[in-house]
Each structure stands twice: as C-alpha cells, then as structure tokens.
Amino acid sequence: MSLRPSTKTEIRRIRYKVSVDAEEGRRRREDFLVEIRKSKRNENLMKKRRVKVLPPDYKLISNDPFESLLEIANMITGVFSDDPSLQLEYTTRFRVVLSFDRSPPTDNVIKSGVVPRFVEFLKKDDNPKLQFEAAWALTNIASGASEHTKVVIDHGVVPLFVQLLASPDDDVREQAIWGLGNVAGDSIQCRDFVLNSGAFIPLLHQLNNHATLSILRNATWTLSNFFRGKPSPPFDLVKHVLPVLKRLVYSDDEQVLIDACWALSNLSDASNENIQSVIEAGVVPRLVELLQHASPVVLVPALRCIGNIVSGNSQQTHCVINCGVLPVLADLLTQNHMRGIRREACWTISNITAGLEEQIQSVIDANLIPSLVNLAQHAEFDIKKEAIWAISNASVGGSPNQIKYLVEQNCIKALCDILVCPDLRIILVSLGGLEMILIAGEVDKNLRDVNCYSQMIEDAEGLEKIENLQHHGNNEIYEKAVKILQTYGLVEEDGRLVEEEDEGGDGCSHPEFQFDFSR
C-alpha cells in the first residue's frame, strides 16, 4: 500500500519546503560561476602586457649567439651606467624586449640583475622619461607568471607605483596605474597587498573629469581588479567607489563601459550589504539599459551584475524587476545571442524564480516560461541546466495555480527528460521540481481522488526514469527517487502503478493543449 500524506500535512510541508528550497535556489551556482570565470575573455584579462609595434628595420639583438651575448652585456652595462642618456637608452631596450607579444624573456631579464636598477629609476622625479620606461619594464614583468609578480613585489615596487600616481607626468601616472593593476590581478593576496599599500584613494583621484581617455581606461580596468576575487575587499572601499562607477557606466567609451561593468559585477558578487549599496547607488536602471547594448562584451558583465543582484534578498530582486528587466531577459532568451549570454540569462531568471510567488508571477506574466521550457528541451546542455534550475525553482516556490501553469507549458516533460543526464546536481534539482508538482497535485485532486500530475509524469516517460534512479550510485538521488515513487502514489508494494488507468479512464481532466511527447 502506498504512503500518502494528508492534504493538511502537505500544505504545511509545501510552505516549509518553499522557505528552505528558495534559499537553496537563490544560492549562486558556484560550479557554474567558476566555469565561466575560468574561461578566457580578452575584455576581462586580469593582467595586460603593454606592447609597442617596432619598425620593420628595427634591430634589437643579433641572431648570432655570440653577438647576442655581447649585446645583452652592453645593455646591462648601459643600465648601470652613470650617464642618464645611456640609462634611458638601455632601459628602453630592456623594455622593448619585455614587450614582445609572445614569450618575452622575462626570466632572463630578471636573472640579469637589472630589476633593482629599474626600481632606482622609479625614484628619479627629475627624469620622468626614465621613470616611465622603468615603470613600463616592471609592469610587463608583473604581467607574467605569479613568480614574476612576486619579484616586483619583493623589490618594493608597489609603494613606489602608488607614489607615482601623484606624478605631474601623465605617461608616468598611467604606467603606474597599469602596473598596480597587473599586481592586483595576480591573486587575492597581491590585490590586498596593493590595497594595503594605499593605492585605492589615489587611484580614484585618477578617475576625475579631466583624465585623458587612456588614463580613464587603465584606471577603470585597475579598479575592476581591486574588487576581483573572494573574500571581497573591506566594505568601506565599496562606499567610496560606487559614485565613481555610477558616472563611468554612462561613459561613451566601450572599454570604460566594459571594465566599469566588471567592477560592479565583482562588487555585487558578495554580501547582500554590497548588493544593497549597488542598488542605492542608482546604477540598476543603467545596467538594465546595457543589457540591450550592441556589444556582447558590454552586455555580459552587465548581465552578470544583474544576476548577482537578484541573487540577493527578495526586496533587492524586486528592485531589479521594477526596473523592467524581465522583458529584456525575454529578448536575451529568444534572440540570436551568444550561447554564454543565453546561459547567464537563464541563470539570472533562476534567481528570480527562487523568490516570492509575486516574483514568480512576474516571470510568468513576462511570458518567460515557454522560452525556458524550450531551452530546457532543445538547447546545449549548459543552457539546459540553467533553464531547469529556473523551472524547478518556480515549481518549488510557486502557488498551485502557478504550478498548474508550469504544467500547461509542458515543464513536466522537460524535468523528466533531464533525469538521464550525467550531472548529479541537476538530477536532484529536477527531482525536487517534480516532487513539488506532485505535492500540488495531491492538494488539487479531483473528485475521483486522482493526482493528475502523476499520470502526466508517466506519459512523459518520467516514471521509468525515476524507477531507474532507484539503482543510481548516488545515495541522495536514490533516496529521492524512492521517496517520490512511494509517497505520491506512483507504486504499490508489487511495483505497479496505483493510479494507472482503469477501463473507465484515469479520471483526470487534461488541459486542452496537446503534449508533444515524441521529441
């Protein structure tokens, strides 16, 4: 005999489970975020090497090994000369070597012993050209591997770069900004070292209305590196930077827009306190506008930031909805956008459907559910997963009428189809969604005491899939599958369906639409 809970018990259980699973659903999917953060994006590099195109006839080092050794020895001698003109000439030569776009000989330059000399040149306030060339060389060393960045830090370069932010020479200031960005982009520890060296406020001063476009671009990029990674920098820094970022997201320059949006994305990928500060800064309406930007490299960080904000509390999510984000997200799902954009749009919607019934209704009213179901059935697997999250979250937190609407949009078929995927977590997410649909069916049984949704799961070939999961190697999946089969009237002790059709039919009043189960 099947175990079947009473209606009152199930109503209480629905309310309890919604409160628990909504929080689970609202969590950022760390596996997903780590995956997209690891992907290389040219517009969001943590380090940048400054290169300069040389004339075709420029000859730096001979191809002959013996002559090459002599030339390198001459370069070292020139750098350590007391003649300022030779210092500048040969520091420039080393800088050019370090500016090679591919495989610069950074290790050999470090081993040559010239780094301490470059550090000395940073202090030559009376020779800004030499300061600039030395700063450029050190910036490119810091753009290498972590051990190269460590060499720069260990030689005391960071405090000197901070001092150079006050230089009257634009080129020197810009190069110091770039160097600090490379050091901060290496790791959380390096980022914190730069911040603890007093770089933050002087950097903000570079982002004034009189800055050159080149300085504005580099300072915005460095600022985005200051807020990259976890744990986040101290909250006091957030309060200082938001007014600046609010101005930058209205820039006409695409590169400034990109890095300002990444900075906001990094800021919002933290506590609800950070998210609230971003909202109070008044940037959300602009971020929603940028979701319609023609350039994907602007759209992506703006979308990431919106997704982070709606992963906050319900009030914060509501603020984004009120700014008109849902129709824009609908376009991102249906227009011919990049795969990553559709995936992150689904992720963003999944954070909204993890909220209140009112917010789920907003998603329904924006006609997003049909698009989500379509993606869950036909898109690439990484998009399917996020669409399933969105659908499952809606079923977990939705009212019986909302769940009925989800069923009418063929969500049962989508949730059942994903049960054969290799992703353990998404199998559990789908089972959780199906369980909540079955709970709603228990509350809304018809006069013949039949849970119509259980029959729909069988029609969608879900019963067989759930039965197969009883043999799954993952214990949590096994237990969930057994629980669903036993608790919601899908099996008897002999394994047969309790609510299978008899000669008089199943007693369910099916919707007028037709399911397409042949796909």
Curated annotation (Swiss-Prot):
Ranges occupied by ARM repeats: 103-143, 146-185, 188-228, 230-269, 272-311, 314-354, 357-396, 400-439
Domain IBB: 1-58
Main subcellular localisation: nucleus
Keywords from the named record: Nucleus, Protein transport, Repeat, Transport
Keyword Phosphoprotein in annotation: no
Recorded superkingdom: Eukaryota
Gene Ontology BP, a term: protein import into nucleus
GO cellular component: cytoplasm; nuclear envelope
Compartmental location: Nucleus envelope
Signal peptide interval: none
GO molecular function (one): nuclear import signal receptor activity
InterPro entries: ARM-like (IPR011989), ARM-type_fold (IPR016024), Arm_3 (IPR032413), Armadillo (IPR000225), Importin-a_IBB (IPR002652), Importin-a_IBB_sf (IPR036975), Importin_alpha (IPR024931)
Family note: Belongs to the importin alpha family.
Subunit structure of this chain's protein: Forms a complex with importin subunit beta-1.
Function: Binds to conventional NLS motifs and mediates nuclear protein import across the nuclear envelope.
Protein name: Importin subunit alpha-5
Species name: Arabidopsis thaliana (Mouse-ear cress)
Gene, per the UniProt record: IMPA5
